[in-house]
């Protein structure tokens, strides 16, 4: 069953919530497609080689066509020369974007939440707000929950809470409207506000 642990203000277990049964029935392939698309979208397009059009020099024929006994050559910048161009090499103009439609994106999130809930790794709380904006207070929350790392899902993300969690390498804070299947899958635990959970399940 896809059950969510409900925690009180002292982060003690005070009950359970249940995700819609349809979440666990989603085809896992939707999660695969979305994660593949997400990773492709954030891929750094850094591999770049120069074709003959972009290598400087080589405009002059290095030697006459006939009479030397050697192979003919028209430029010092062809791909067979040291310092020459690269034939069919990668360029930073390549676009790795892979389209995933809204329905698949939604189904991927539903399945990711169902799997996480089945593992008992989703915790619902009334509110996660750090008025001080201090990382120390954010770290205490994670310590009290006794989790290795966590995705924090707020219904409405505020600057102070974002600031407090930003310096914690094992945490990431996201708005309910921005949460996605990749983030849910990446972190071992999900801490979600009840209002945020209502927002997410309402969209399904």
UniProtKB/Swiss-Prot annotation:
Keyword Metal-binding applies: no
Gene3D superfamilies: 3.40.1370.10
A cellular component annotation (GO) from this entry: ribosome
Ribosomal protein in keyword set: yes
Region feature (Disordered): 53-73
Keywords, sorted A to Z: Ribonucleoprotein, Ribosomal protein, RNA-binding, rRNA-binding
GO function term, MF aspect, one: structural constituent of ribosome
Domain of life the protein comes from: Bacteria
Matching InterPro entries: Ribosomal_uL4, Ribosomal_uL4-like, Ribosomal_uL4_dom_sf
Family: Belongs to the universal ribosomal protein uL4 family.
Function of the protein: One of the primary rRNA binding proteins, this protein initially binds near the 5'-end of the 23S rRNA. It is important during the early stages of 50S assembly. It makes multiple contacts with different domains of the 23S rRNA in the assembled 50S subunit and ribosome. Forms part of the polypeptide exit tunnel.
Name of the protein described by the UniProt record: Large ribosomal subunit protein uL4
Gene of this entry: rplD
């Amino acid at each position: 069953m896809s059950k969510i642990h409900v925690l009180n203000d002292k982060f003690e277990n005070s009950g359970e919530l249940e995700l819609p049964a349809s979440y666990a029935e989603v085809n896992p392939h939707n999660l695969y497609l979305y994660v593949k698309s997400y990773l492709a979208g954030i891929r750094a397009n850094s591999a770049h080689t120069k074709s003959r059009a972009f290598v400087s020099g080589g405009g002059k024929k290095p030697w006459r066509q006939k009479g030397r006994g050697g192979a003919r050559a028209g430029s010092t910048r062809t791909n067979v020369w040291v310092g020459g161009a690269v034939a069919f090499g990668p360029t930073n103009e390549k676009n790795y974007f892979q389209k995933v439609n809204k329905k698949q994106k939604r189904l991927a999130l539903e399945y990711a939440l169902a799997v996480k809930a089945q593992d008992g790794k989703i915790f619902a709380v009334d509110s996660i707000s750090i008025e001080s904006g201090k990382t120390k207070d954010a770290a205490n929350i994670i310590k009290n929950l006794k989790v290795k790392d966590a995705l924090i899902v707020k219904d409405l993300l505020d600057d102070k809470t974002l600031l407090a969690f930003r310096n914690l390498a094992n945490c990431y804070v996201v708005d309910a409207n921005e949460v996605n299947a990749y983030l849910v899958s990446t972190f071992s635990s999900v801490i979600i506000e009840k209002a945020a959970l209502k927002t997410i399940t309402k969209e399904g």
